[in-house]
């Protein structure tokens, strides 16, 4: 699925834009996703879409 972290499953959230006059419009909060080369368990290198929180916390192994 696009716009989804392949490690933790983080997806876009739905919220509101609120103006000073308190007019409300729907908006989406997208996770910060990056395409990263990752070392798989079988030794292969694969490109996966991962959020920056997973990269920072070391949940993926870079080749």
Swiss-Prot record:
Q: What Pfam families does this protein map onto?
A: Ribosomal_L28 (PF00830)
Q: List the disulfide bonds.
A: none
Q: Which GO terms describe its biological process?
A: translation
Q: Which GO terms describe its cellular component?
A: ribonucleoprotein complex; ribosome
Question: Does the keyword section mention Ribosomal protein?
Answer: yes
Protein family per UniProt: Belongs to the bacterial ribosomal protein bL28 family.
For this protein, the record's HAMAP family field holds: Ribosomal_bL28
Protein's recorded name: Large ribosomal subunit protein bL28
Name the source organism.
Desulfatibacillum aliphaticivorans
């Amino acid at each position: 699925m696009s716009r989804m972290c392949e490690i933790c499953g983080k997806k876009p959230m739905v919220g509101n834009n609120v103006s000073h006059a308190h007019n409300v419009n729907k908006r989406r909060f997208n996770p910060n996703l990056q395409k990263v080369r990752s070392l798989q368990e079988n030794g292969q290198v694969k490109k996966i879409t991962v959020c920056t929180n997973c990269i920072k916390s070391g949940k993926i192994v870079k080749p």
